[in-house]
């Protein structure tokens, strides 16, 4: 069975403040028609996907995401589908951060997928 996928990481001792100059950097490769979007889980447990997308056309490339001036949409973490737009979410206390591929894969083989490595978050720590 092929489905959408979310990959997220968290710091056990701190939230991340993604306001200001915060950045998410990763080495990524997208294949087929797949693109990935930044995704966060804010302190109240809400999952949000950002409007910026990354498409590398099969090449391994370093990608960097700035969180400012991005549109955010609610994500159902069980179904990995987007919902309504969330205006001005509070990104000062983010519990988890990562990427989401909202397109289901093609099943066996690599009809469409993404690879992710070397994930780096540049943000201010906020004590839990």
Model region roles, listed by residue range:
Residues 36, 46-48, 94-95, 102, ...:
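Aromatic-residue detector
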Residues 121-126:
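Charged interaction scaffolds used for protein-protein
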């Amino acid at each position: 069975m092929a489905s959408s996928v979310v990959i997220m990481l968290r710091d056990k001792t701190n939230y991340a403040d993604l306001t200001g100059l915060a950045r998410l950097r990763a080495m990524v490769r997208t294949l087929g028609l797949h693109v990935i979007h930044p995704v966060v889980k804010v302190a109240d447990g809400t999952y949000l996907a950002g409007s910026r997308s990354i498409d590398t056309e099969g090449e391994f490339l370093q990608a960097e995401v700035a969180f400012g001036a991005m549109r955010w949409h609610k994500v159902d973490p069980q179904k990995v589908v987007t919902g309504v737009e969330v205006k001005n979410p509070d990104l000062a206390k983010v519990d988890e951060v990562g990427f989401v591929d909202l397109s289901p894969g093609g099943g066996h083989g690599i009809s469409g997928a993404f690879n992710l490595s070397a994930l780096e978050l540049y943000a201010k720590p906020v004590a839990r």
